[in-house]
Each structure stands twice: as C-alpha cells, then as structure tokens.
UniProtKB/Swiss-Prot annotation:
NCBIfam families: hrcA (TIGR00331). Belongs to the HrcA family. This is Heat-inducible transcription repressor HrcA. The keyword Iron-sulfur does not apply. InterPro entries: GAF-like_dom_sf, HrcA, HrcA_C, WH-like_DNA-bd_sf, WH_DNA-bd_sf, WHTH_transcript_rep_HrcA_IDD.
Length: 342
C-alpha cells in the first residue's frame, strides 16, 4: 500500500525522534514535540496503520513504537533530509589529513578514524584491490641462472616483488630492454588489463625486443596479485560499545561482523564498482545484521574505482548527517589518492 502524506509525515517524525532519544515513541510525544497538525487520537490511528503495514513495531511495555527495518528503509529512501556539512566541519575533516605524509596507508587509516569520530559509529575502509591498482613502473632484475626478480611499483605506492623462473639465462642488458618496452606499453594500466588485453596485443604485434615474446606469458601470469593482501582499516569500537550498551545480543553480532575480515572485504568490494552512497539496513545485507546499518561509497584513483569506505552502526544512526559525511569523505579521499598517484 502506498503511504499517504500523513503517513509519511508521522513516520518521519517518529524515526527522527527515535534516532534522537533511543526509546519507543508514542502519540503524545509526537503531538508535544513535532508540528504534525493532528490530534493525539488521529496520530494514534496513523501509528496503528504504519504498524499494520510493517513500518513500525510495538513495544508493549511502554506503549510506544519503534521503526522496523522496512520503516528505516523507507525513511532513508524517501524521507530523510540530508544535512549539509558546514565549512567548519569540512575543514575539520581536511585538517586530519594535513597532519600526515601523503602515503596511501596513512590516508586510509586516517579515513577510518575520521568516519568513526564524526559519525559516532565504526569507520571502515577497504584498501585497493591489487588487481585494480595501476602500474607506475616495472623493473626486471637478473638474480641468478634462470631466476628473474620482477618489481612492480603501483600508482598507490604499493611495491610488489615476484620471482620468476625462466627457461634460459637472460643477461641484465636483455632484461633492461624488455623492462623498457614494458614500461612504455604497460604504464597506467591495471593488472587485469595488462594480463587480459595489453600483453596479448603486444604478443600479436611482435614489435618488442627479441626476448619479449619468450618470457611475456611468464611475466603476465606472475603479476597475479594475492587479494588477501587487501588491507582493512577499522576504527570506532568504543562507539559501538556505547551504541549497543543495552543490547548485548546486537553488540555481540556487530562485533562478530567486524571480526570476520574475509566477509567484510567481500561485502564492501561489491560496492567498489557502484557510484553513489549506499545504505544497507539489517537483512538488506547477505548475512544476519539485525539492528545494524552500513553506509558505504567507493573512492577512486582518477576515474578508476579502487576501494570502498563507510560506517557501521546501529539502525538508529543519524542518517541525515551520516550520508553526507560518507559522500564528502569519499570524494576527498579520491582527490588525495589521485594526487599521490601522479
């Protein structure tokens, strides 16, 4: 059933009140504190409708009502009025980054802290997947006999080392020529593009050094990144203890969620390719997250989407501030990551 404007007005007022006070909300509270323009009796009728439709649930001990996951979902999608961060708040966020050297790991660690402190939830950042990072420089070094060391310097500042065993002994001069050819042709591409597009095309062209085609496939396969190397940055456990202090089961659940790094990496990675800010509420997620909401957005290096960040907290989080916070932070991180990659 479509909600009327009266239903929407009262649902918004109730969710706003519950987020602010964290206790069930009754018709008297809505009448006294919100300019709804209805009598308490009319408000009670609308509240009963909203409960029947699945947007609210009763707390019989108090007589008040609380939002359900469906209620929160409608509130976030249709009712929330986004707060605009003030210049002072934006400058506070920017100041946190000016305290550090511009290195990727420091930026991402600081981002988790910023998100946590300004949202009163847990801040989380997923570092770039190695196969999405773009190549800045490659070097091949003869180690001994049939062993070559390949050094990959990525735009993010990550340095990867790979030992390759070949079918013959190559001189350092030959490896220098291959390295130069690869740098001229591979720079700026990510590992997926290098393996699946660029190197195959170079092998067809056959305009490289004499030794290139003999070792190209070995070099390409050796570039495979270990995606377990993806780093996870989390801050704000104290906020979660405070938010869920009266809800032991939900606290245990959210701590278990944060302890499952494999799940978190997989979960947030699903949003790297998605533009915009996403809100996942409770069972919207692909595992039990009752009472928990996640707000996430990606960040970019230039035009390339390389990672994700966000906040995890109670469903009663202040969405009108949390959503613009995540949005602004993702854009700021994208600017800084792009700057250090040049």
């Amino acid at each position: 059933m479509d909600l009327t404007e009266r239903h929407k007005r009262i649902l918004k007022a109730l969710v706003d009140e519950f987020i602010q006070e964290n206790r069930p909300v009754g018709s008297k509270t809505l009448f006294d504190k919100h300019d709804i323009g209805l009598s308490p009796a009319s408000i009670r009728t609308v509240l009963k409708d909203l409960e029947d439709y699945g947007y609210l649930a009763s707390k019989h001990t108090s007589g008040g009502r609380i939002p359900t996951e469906r209620g929160y979902r409608f509130y976030v999608d249709s009712l929330v009025i986004l707060y605009e961060l003030t210049l002072k708040e934006k400058q506070r966020i920017q100041q946190e980054y000016l305290k550090m050297q511009f290195k990727l790991d420091q930026i991402l660690k600081a981002t988790a802290s910023v998100l946590s402190s300004l949202s009163n939830a847990a801040g989380i950042v997923i570092g770039p997947a190695k196969n999405l990072d773009t190549l800045k420089h490659l070097e091949l070094i003869h180690v001994r006999g049939d062993e070559i060391l390949m050094i990959l310097v990525m735009r993010s500042g990550t340095v990867l080392h790979r030992n390759i065993f070949v079918d013959r002994n190559y001189s350092q001069e030959a490896l220098y020529q291959v390295s130069k050819y690869l740098n001229d042709n591979l720079k700026g591409y990510d590992i997926y593009e290098i393996q699946n597009v660029v190197v195959p095309n170079l092998m067809v062209r056959r305009d490289g050094p004499e030794d290139f085609t003999r070792i190209a496939e070995l070099l390409s396969s050796a570039m495979n990144p270990d995606n377990s190397e993806v780093t996870l940055y989390i801050d704000g456990f104290k906020n979660l203890y405070a938010n869920f202090r009266d809800e032991e089961q939900q606290l245990s659940q959210v701590l278990s969620l944060l302890d499952d790094q494999g799940f978190l990496k997989e979960f947030f990675s699903e949003y790297i390719d998605q533009d915009g800010v996403y809100t996942i509420i409770g069972k919207d997620g692909n595992r039990s997250m009752s009472g928990v909401s996640i707000i996430t957005s990606n960040y970019k290096m230039g035009e390339k989407k390389i990672g994700a960040l966000g906040i995890i907290g109670p469903q009663r989080m202040d969405y009108n501030r949390a959503l613009p916070l995540v949005d602004f932070t993702s854009k700021l991180v994208s600017e800084m990551v792009t700057r250090i990659s040049k």
